[in-house]
Amino acid sequence: PLYSSAASDVYKRQDISIITNIELDHEKWLGSTLEQIGLQKAAILKQGKIGILGSDSMPLSVTSKSKEICKKTLQLGKEFRVSSQNNKWSYSIPHKNFELEDIDSGNLNHESAACALSAYKMLLEDDIDFKKVIEATHLPGRCHSIEHFILDVSHNPASVKNLIQFLDRNHKDIKFNAIFSAMSDKDCESIINEISQYISEWNICSIEDTRFNISELINITEHITNKSVVKHDSVYSAVERSYHEKVPCIVFGSFITVSQAYQAIEKIKKENHEDH
């Protein structure tokens, strides 16, 4: 109750609402079309406040709602812009006469970072080194590199595309083993199809969740790819094997998978340190 009260209070006092993008996910609760999901997400927009939209192809249910109730709407591709080339990206918000160029990509999603920049520029005029701040910002669980592992909580086709963009920028022409577990209510076929060409071996891990079915996931993976598929009774088992083999490895598919992989890596590193 205390958390709910605090969260509700923050919502009531917010000056800016940000909707980064709309993709098919959590259809059971949000709806089966982008317009339906957009309508649900648009509920965070506040009357008389600022709405920031982080996609140039937002559903009409979002853009129309924002224009209807927000005092100002900023949308990617219109009121602020992003461009990228190689390992750099640039940002501009013309009506504020502000732009940044040649920002190191890091592991941040460019569009989401641009939303945060736009929000800051709408609230404050502080003269700070934005480029330095952005390049020093790191999100755990998003394209996070630890030794020869890349951990990413991507669990739908859209977020996997962001992971692929990161791989193309930073690890071009490298093949990875995958440590992968995704819930049965996700679009597993599309997820696997998107990233399959980057994967040499699939390690499918069992996780304790009523939405998870390892036999079904293995069948889908074997049907889509012609790569080796290895079954593990835990994320720890897959991480331990990959850790000692020192093969480049991507961990993705769910928050649970990545969380357990973080724990496994830390435990194995600690054990190895104690042995030496």
Question: Where are the predicted features?
Answer:
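Positively charged, low-complexity/disordered segments
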Residues: 1-7
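Nucleotide phosphate-binding/pyrophosphate-handling subdomain across enzymes
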Residues: 8-18, 22, 96-201
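Acidic, Mg2+-coordinating active-site environments of NTP-dependent enzymes
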Residues: 14-103, 109, 113-128
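A glycine-rich beta-strand to alpha-helix segment
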Residues: 237-266
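Short, flexible loop segments at boundaries between secondary-structure elements
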Residues: 271-276
